[in-house]
Amino acid sequence: MNHLAEAEYRFACLVWDNEPLPSGQLVKLSAAELGWKKSTTYTVLKKLCERGILQNEGGTVTSLVKKEEVQCAESAA
């Protein structure tokens, strides 16, 4: 089971609910839903891509792991 911090989980939910998602649209969604700046969005996206949760291919963000396979660390505690 993959564990995500609450903010990471909320970010991943944006992808799961809207994928496939152009990265520019993800930046706008993150700003509207999470109050994040562009740099924050790309930092978290990179982190989740490195962990094999999401992928960003050709500017399109999709998930590699289903929502059901991920647990929010806060709900696991």
Task: Enumerate the language-model features and the residues they cover.
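Short, cationic-aromatic polyanion-contact patches
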Residues: 2-7, 59-77
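Hydrophobic residues on short alpha-helical segments
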Residues: 8-15
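Conserved hydrophobic residue
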Residues: 20-21, 54
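Short acidic, hydrophobic short linear motifs in intrinsically disordered regions
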Residues: 21-30
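Basic amphipathic alpha-helical segments that dock to polyanions
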Residues: 43-49
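A short, conserved structural fragment
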Residues: 49-59
